[in-house]
């Protein structure tokens, strides 16, 4: 289990990303299509004023059961340990253990 503080921090980041996503995209597009250097530098200053945790790159994929960040399977939203456990308990529809 991940620490509760870490999970809360991750939730806060997700909320910030959701809140500032449209504004960040608008600023990036205007920077991309700006014609003058001074306009570009002003827009970059505006972009820098946004919170650092509002960047999507700061998010970390976590298991929704345990909150573990490592060994994460995107298709299931689970860590490797929980995927194995839930697979053996037949809790994931369509998942079968390989045998050949």
From Swiss-Prot:
GO terms for biological process: translation. InterPro entries: Ribosomal_uS14, Ribosomal_uS14_bac/plastid, Ribosomal_uS14_CS. Keywords: Chloroplast, Plastid, Ribonucleoprotein, Ribosomal protein, RNA-binding, rRNA-binding. One of its GO terms (molecular function) is rRNA binding. GO terms for cellular component: chloroplast; small ribosomal subunit. Pfam families: Ribosomal_S14. It is found in: Plastid, Chloroplast. SUPFAM superfamilies: Glucocorticoid receptor-like (DNA-binding domain) (SSF57716). HAMAP family: Ribosomal_uS14_1. Belongs to the universal ribosomal protein uS14 family. Part of the 30S ribosomal subunit. Binds 16S rRNA, required for the assembly of 30S particles. This is Small ribosomal subunit protein uS14c. The gene is rps14.
């Amino acid at each position: 289990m991940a620490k509760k503080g870490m999970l809360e921090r991750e939730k806060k980041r997700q909320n910030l990303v959701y809140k500032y996503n449209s504004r960040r995209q608008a600023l990036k597009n205007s920077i991309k299509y700006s014609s003058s250097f001074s306009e570009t530098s002003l827009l970059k200053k505006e972009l820098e004023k946004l919170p650092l945790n509002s960047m999507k790159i700061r998010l970390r994929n976590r298991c929704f059961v345990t909150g573990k960040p490592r060994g994460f399977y995107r298709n299931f939203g689970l860590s490797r340990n929980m995927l194995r456990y839930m697979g053996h308990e037949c809790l994931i529809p369509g998942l079968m253990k390989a045998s050949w």
